Amino acid sequence: YTTPATLRAGHRYSFSVGDMPAQAQHIASGRSDWMKYLPDNAFLSQISIPGSHDACAIYGSHYEYKSGMPHERYHFKWLLSWLGNTNTTKVTKAQELSIEEQLAAGVRMFDLRPCASSASVKDLPIHHGISVLGDPARGGYTPGASGRQELSPFLLSQVLDRFVRFLEEHPGETLLVHMKYENTSTNANKRGWNKSVVSCIKSRCNGRIADFTPRMTLADARGKILFVIREDYKSDNGGEYLGAYLNWTNDKVVFETTLHGNTGEAAPIKVNDLYNIKNGASDGVSKYAAIDECIAYTYN
């Protein structure tokens, strides 16, 4: 097509732009398979990958109060007694789309927060802070019903099953799954968390676990999940990581750290973790500056 453009007063120009490159056309029209059109030799570190913060925080808590509407989800009963009958969705809800809808929209990195309630657990519920997140897809919720209902919670095993099903149907894609130890003021249950996460990943994602190296390509990861886990759990997995270990420092504006795999090599990474934003222009400025710093880092 041809379009006019004014570059300076009194001078007019025109220029022609050809068709969109074939890869870009495919990516724009098919978000469920956008990665398969990228070249195999593209480094994973070169790709801008859409991600989902607290990916399971879709409906809030697994407790429902009275109205039966998805936007009326509430925290635990004891938290309700503390807050009163106040809609606490703003505290827990972070997403509008289900896991399946996020995958179909092109999201490829998912932030999961499993919680260990004891030192010996078989499966892990997904949390947002202190709140167990409800999963209506698993039943236990009757729209329009009166009184409190208990939704089935999101469980790590079943979220991983959904990821594996997606990769079976879309083998050209890859997923990144970030995990951290959630909802605890002590490390009393850390060993149980480590063992449960390792067991769950191995049993649910057998043959789908991507090995991390700093120069891994898309070909190395197609049809697989690259786990990026903040906890150093390798002593509970025979001295090896399942994917990458992310050495993390909490609540810093911007910090540099490393990703580690099993090859002994480390990849540098810059993180913006300024999440505790208060009202006020100065906090917003700090957040935007931190984002800009990280974006600039990716181009250097």
Predicted regions and their residues:
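Catalytic domains of cell-wall/extracellular-matrix polysaccharide-remodeling enzymes
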Residues: 184-233, 238-247
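Hydrophobic faces of well-ordered beta-strands that scaffold small-molecule active sites
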Residues: 45-47, 110-112, 175-179, 227-229
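Long, acidic (Asp/Glu-rich), low-complexity accessory segments flanking structured domains
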Residues: 7-105, 118-169, 174, 233
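A short, solvent-exposed beta-strand micro-motif common in secreted/extracellular proteins
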Residues: 1-2
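Short, well-ordered coil/turn segments that N-cap beta-strands
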Residues: 106-108, 171-175, 221-225
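Glycogenin-like
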Residues: 144-212
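Solvent-exposed loop/turn segments at secondary-structure junctions
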Residues: 53-55, 109, 114-118, 181-186, ...
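C-terminal active-site rim and adjoining tail of enzyme catalytic domains
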Residues: 228-300
